[in-house]
Amino acid sequence: MGRFISVSFGLLVVFLSLSGTGADFDCPSGWSAYDWYCYKPFNEPQTWDDAERFCTEQAKGGHLVSIESSGEADFVGQLVSENIQRPEIYVWIGLRDRRKEQQCSSEWSDGTSIIYVNWNKGESQMCQGLSKWTNFLKWDNTDCQAKNPFVCKFPPQC
């Protein structure tokens, strides 16, 4: 009976260690996992276009980070606060205004729908960055040609 309990407890420990993180996959070394995606902040300032190009070269499906929930916003804000050690005020995210037939609309660079927004008061145009003044939680617009650190995101391959 004691052996049965010991084996059962061992299996429970293994199960709990493999579940509960929301990340039953491996991200490459130096990348952080959250809700089925891998994330990494980069300190080297780039323009928005150059940062997006860099992210697409990191992994299949890679782009500047799209933020789809308040939980993800908190995770990315914490990741940036802990890893971006530069004086820049903004950190690029994958949101950008696009002009289509006389109309402007914002879209994520990875093509996902905008279902969560967290613009700083009065902001919603040009390229978007996480603002240092809001602990990297709110989005501000800034010139797309400005050079800022950035965060890449990609879905890991099975």
UniProtKB/Swiss-Prot annotation:
**Tissue occurrence:** Expressed by the venom gland.
PROSITE patterns per the record? C_TYPE_LECTIN_2
**A Gene Ontology CC term for this entry?**
extracellular region
Primary location: secreted
Q: What does this protein do?
A: Interferes with one step of hemostasis (modulation of platelet aggregation, or coagulation cascade, for example).
The UniProt subunit note reads as follows: Heteromultimer; disulfide-linked.
Taken from the record, one Pfam family name reads Lectin_C
User: Cystine bridges: which residues?
Assistant: 27-38, 55-152, 127-144
Keywords, alphabetical: Disulfide bond, Hemostasis impairing toxin, Secreted, Signal, Toxin
Q: What species is this protein from?
A: Trimeresurus stejnegeri (Chinese green tree viper)
Tell me the protein's name: Snaclec stejaggregin-A subunit alpha
